[in-house]
Amino acid sequence: MDPFILAAIISGIVIIILSIAFLRVSQVKPQAAARPRAVVQRDGGPGRVQAVRNQRARMRANAARHQAALEEEPEIQEEADEGAPDIDQKIDFDDKMGAKKRAKMEAKLEKKKAHEAEEHLREIKKKKEEEQEQERKKIEEKQEEEERKREEAEKKAEDERKKREQEEYEAMKAAFSIEGEGFDENEEEDRESLLRDFIGYIKTQKVVLLEDLAAHFKLKTQAAIDRITELQASGELTGVIDDRGKFIYISQSELESIAKFIKQRGRVSIAELAECSNDLINLAPVTVP
């Protein structure tokens, strides 16, 4: 082989080897440059810088742990906070507070406000019901007192009526009695005959003016009234004395007709009874054959 060609080949191989070696050296230098360089000492040396770094790292770790603890807070603590007396106080939300914690505290506060509003409404309703109950009791007590007074008044009026009737009966009895000695059978018969005439006259007339009745039997008007009252009490005479000074005799059959009329109608007013009285009661004098 030609020596010149051989020399050229060897030269090329050498160049290639040198190029590869140069490239490897170039790659090693950047890696060495990327390694941390020694910190230049400033104002107190490396010890102070490292202390600052450690303090910051501890602060970040504490903040992370605090945030995790707040997010994992148990529901029991929430219920305890709801029962606390100062929960309704104004809460100052910190700008550094987490969004989840802020939302929980806001929800807790709203829940407490709603609970207080419901409690307030219940208290108002309870107070109103108590007032209504007291008012109802007052009304019932007033009605019971009025009923008691009414019953006492009715009882008193009934007692006075009975007492008055008894007094009238005694007066009537005394009017028909004969006083003194010398009482005999003929005088008793005359008295009974006079009483029968008195009753018969009223029954036949049906409606008699008390003054005319007294004049007919030569009695005082009050004496005639007393006799009628006594006969009514004994059941020998039935009727009513109206406000015009007349006595209206009502027979037993007419009383039964009135009772039957009232029973058929159920409830009858005085006006209706007065309107139908002409059909139920015969007011015309009875002709004695």
UniProtKB/Swiss-Prot annotation:
Ranges for region Disordered: 65-168
tRNA processing among keywords: no
Subcellular locations according to the entry: Endoplasmic reticulum membrane
GO CC list: endoplasmic reticulum membrane
Alphabetized Pfam families for the sequence: DDRGK (PF09756)
Coiled-coil regions, chain positions: none
Record topology, Cytoplasmic segments: 24-289
Basic and acidic residues biased stretches: 87-166
GO MF, one annotated term: ubiquitin-like protein ligase binding
Keywords per UniProt: Endoplasmic reticulum, Membrane, Transmembrane, Transmembrane helix, Ubl conjugation pathway
Main location: endoplasmic reticulum
Keyword Secreted recorded: no
Membrane topology type: Single-pass membrane protein
Record topology, Lumenal segments: 1-2
Segments of skewed composition (Acidic residues): 70-85
PANTHER family linked: DDRGK DOMAIN-CONTAINING PROTEIN 1
Subunit structure as annotated in this protein's UniProt entry: Interacts with Atg9; the interaction is transient.
Family designation: Belongs to the DDRGK1 family.
Task performed by this protein: Substrate adapter for ufmylation, the covalent attachment of the ubiquitin-like modifier UFM1 to substrate proteins. Required for ufmylation of Atg9; protects the nervous system during aging, possibly by stabilizing Atg9 and supporting its function.
Protein name as it appears in the record: DDRGK domain-containing protein 1
Source organism of this protein record: Bombyx mori
